[in-house]
């Protein structure tokens, strides 16, 4: 202030100046009805760190309880997982242990592990399982008791220790481990024909009875008995008639031997292990063993010298061709399928399956078989061919059905026999027989049964646009063309007059030069009466025609009253063999003049 003093006006101006915040604060204080809304009192600093620690401990305890509940539900699965780790190689067990360690459960109970007595189980197989189970399963409760979870773990631990003890006894008695003779099936429902079973605590009289009872369902039984600290120890090698699962075999042993499933060790044998096969072959000659049935192939193949020599035998194509020829197989798919099925019986078929070029062998086998069959058929006379064909037809027929049918169609039987004789002997100008008539008169049934009996070939005019549609005539003794239309007869009248005569013609072959052949006996069915059509005048002298005017007779159910099939033609040729003049001059009265065809060298046994 001015030392000289302050005037009244200056004082009023100075006191009248105020800030906006002061006015707003005053208005708010005037408008509020709540007293002491804001506590501006000072407080002392409390123990906030202890409160935070309590909250963290509560959350941690809650998470631990949740984890324990989840582990309690899947306790048995955890035990199976740990057991599988102990049975698998070390390279696979490490990742599974990491999965269990990641759960956090192991760290939580690390201070509550109960030490398992090392003398309670055997070394090797059972020790790892016991250590895992002691760390995971044996957890004491807060009140000092053992809950249901721990009771289950103890039972599982005892079962694992029992299995380990049984494995130790097995190795002590047989000087070889059980796992060296068997392979592991993890699933009890996996089926197999061969099973290895070790049974403990069985009664002697039941073991003797099992030798007879098991013969009903087995092809091979090998039983070896020993005595051990658990009583009788029985080792079974069984080959069942049908594949069975572990559960089925367990129930079978429980029923026959009256033992618990915990007292059994069941696994399939190692089929490709030479030491295992040698073990089984050796114990079958021991004094306290029982054997019934034929030795399984997987043992004989690895232990017997003859089987080993057969396994080393190389593949021979000629043997395969001889097999296909004897069974009349000419198609690639049929040869490949049926020859592969012989691999378990024939050494050459087994060698065929080992080849990397099976397709090449199958094609060559089929081609060679067709070559041999065609050459054999060409060399045969018509009488020899008919005898061969009807000899392959099994059964007895009635030749009179053919005679009745010809009589029903008003066909002279002697005229038909004369025409059939000329047809089979391929007389010129009489090399083609035509059966004409309206539909549903039995033409196709009559001709097709004749073709099947003589193993003839079928021509289809639908392929006439191809140059090779007549190629089946190259390998046929008899040919049939069913339901020829006017277009077919026009084609014959234009291009195939010489073929109907029976004289040589040039036949176009696929992938080959044109071949000169004579048409085989040809039988044609048609609805066109060629003999009465002047448009085909030049064919009249080249065909022999029979007309079937009557509809084929049927009964009320629609079944034919006259049945003509391959058996009817077989009986027909046997009955009228002499009338058809089918006997060859060089054929002896003793029977077959030809020796069987062989395309591979005879074996020693066959030659002797």
Swiss-Prot record:
Family: Belongs to the papillomaviridae E1 protein family.
SF3 helicase domain location: 411-561
Catalytic activity: Couples ATP hydrolysis with the unwinding of duplex DNA by translocating in the 3'-5' direction; ATP + H2O = ADP + phosphate + H(+)
Single GO term (MF): DNA binding
Modification Phosphoserine occurs at: 74
Function (record text): ATP-dependent DNA 3'-5' helicase required for initiation of viral DNA replication. It forms a complex with the viral E2 protein. The E1-E2 complex binds to the replication origin which contains binding sites for both proteins. During the initial step, a dimer of E1 interacts with a dimer of protein E2 leading to a complex that binds the viral origin of replication with high specificity. Then, a second dimer of E1 displaces the E2 dimer in an ATP-dependent manner to form the E1 tetramer.
Assembly behavior: Can form hexamers. Interacts with E2 protein; this interaction increases E1 DNA binding specificity. Interacts with host DNA polymerase subunit POLA2. Interacts with host single stranded DNA-binding protein RPA1. Interacts with host TOP1; this interaction stimulates the enzymatic activity of TOP1.
Entry keyword Ribonucleoprotein: no
Superkingdom, natural source: Viruses
Name of the protein in question: Replication protein E1
Entry EC no(s): 5.6.2.4
PTM description: Phosphorylated.
GO cellular component: host cell nucleus
Location, primary (coarse class): host cell
Cystines in this chain: none
Location of region: DNA-binding region: 145-312
InterPro entries in the cross-refs: Helicase_SF3_DNA-vir, P-loop_NTPase, PPV_DNA_helicase_E1_C, PPV_DNA_helicase_E1_N, PPV_E1_DBD, PPV_E1_DBD_sf, Rep_E1_papillomaV, Znf_lg_T-Ag_D1_dom_sf
PROSITE patterns: SF3_HELICASE_1
Binding site for ATP: 437-444
Compartments it resides in: Host nucleus
UniProt entry keywords in alphabetical sequence: ATP-binding, DNA replication, DNA-binding, Early protein, Helicase, Host nucleus, Hydrolase, Isomerase, Nucleotide-binding, Phosphoprotein
A GO BP annotation: DNA replication
């Amino acid at each position: 202030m001015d030392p000289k003093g302050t005037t009244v006006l200056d004082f009023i101006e100075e006191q009248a100046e105020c800030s906006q915040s002061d006015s707003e604060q005053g208005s708010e204080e005037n408008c509020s009805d709540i007293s002491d809304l804001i506590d501006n009192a000072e407080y002392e600093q409390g123990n906030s760190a202890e409160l935070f620690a309590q909250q963290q401990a509560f959350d941690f305890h809650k998470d631990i309880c949740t984890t324990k509940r989840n582990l309690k539900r899947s306790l048995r699965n955890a035990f199976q997982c740990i057991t599988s780790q102990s049975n698998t190689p070390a390279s696979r067990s490490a990742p599974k242990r990491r999965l269990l360690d990641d759960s956090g459960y192991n760290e939580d109970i690390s201070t509550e592990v109960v030490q398992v007595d090392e003398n309670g189980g055997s070394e090797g197989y059972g020790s790892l399982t016991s250590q895992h189970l002691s760390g995971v399963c044996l957890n004491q409760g807060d009140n000092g008791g053992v809950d249901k979870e721990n009771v289950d773990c103890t039972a599982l631990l005892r079962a694992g220790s029992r299995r380990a003890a049984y494995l130790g006894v097995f190795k002590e008695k047989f000087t070889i481990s059980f796992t060296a003779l068997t392979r592991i099936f993890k699933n009890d429902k996996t089926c197999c024909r061969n099973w290895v079973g070790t049974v403990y605590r069985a009664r002697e009289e039941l073991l003797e009875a099992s030798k007879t009872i098991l013969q009903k369902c087995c092809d091979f039984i090998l039983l070896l008995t020993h005595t051990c600290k658990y009583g009788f120890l029985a080792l079974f090698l069984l080959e069942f008639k049908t594949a069975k699962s572990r559960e089925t075999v367990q129930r079978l042993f429980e029923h026959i031997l009256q033992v618990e499933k915990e007292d059994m060790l069941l696994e399939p044998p190692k089929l490709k292990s030479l030491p295992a096969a040698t073990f089984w072959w050796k114990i079958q000659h021991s004094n306290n063993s029982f054997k019934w049935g034929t030795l399984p192939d997987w043992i004989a193949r690895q232990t017997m010298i003859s089987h080993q020599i057969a396994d080393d035998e190389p593949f021979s194509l000629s043997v395969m061709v001889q097999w296909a020829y004897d069974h009349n197989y000419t198609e690639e798919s049929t040869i490949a399928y049926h020859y592969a099925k012989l691999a378990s019986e024939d050494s050459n078929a087994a060698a065929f399956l080992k080849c990397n070029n099976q397709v090449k062998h199958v094609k060559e086998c089929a081609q060679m078989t067709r070559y041999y069959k065609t050459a054999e058929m060409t060399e045969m006379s018509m009488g020899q061919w008919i005898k061969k064909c009807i000899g392959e037809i099994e059964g007895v027929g009635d030749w009179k059905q053919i005679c009745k049918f010809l009589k029903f169609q008003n066909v002279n039987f002697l005229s038909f026999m004369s025409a059939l004789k000329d047809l089979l002997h391929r007389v010129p100008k009489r090399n083609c027989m035509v059966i004409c008539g309206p539909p549903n008169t039995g033409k196709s049934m009559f001709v097709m049964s004749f073709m099947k009996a003589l193993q003839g070939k079928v021509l289809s005019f639908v392929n006439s646009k191809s140059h090779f549609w007549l190629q089946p005539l190259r390998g046929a003794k008899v040919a049939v063309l069913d339901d020829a239309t006017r277009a077919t007869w026009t084609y014959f009248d234009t291009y195939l007059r010489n073929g109907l005569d029976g004289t040589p013609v040039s036949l176009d072959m696929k992938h080959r030069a044109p071949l000169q052949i004579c048409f085989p006996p040809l039988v044609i069915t048609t609805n066109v009466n060629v003999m009465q059509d002047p448009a085909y005048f030049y064919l009249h002298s080249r065909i022999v025609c029979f007309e079937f005017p009557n509809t084929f007779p049927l009964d009320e159910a629609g079944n034919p009253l006259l049945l003509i099939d391959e058996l009817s033609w077989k009986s027909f040729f046997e009955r009228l063999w002499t009338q058809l003049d089918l006997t060859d001059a060089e054929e002896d009265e003793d029977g077959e003049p030809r020796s069987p065809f062989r395309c591979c060298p005879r074996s020693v046994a066959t030659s002797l």
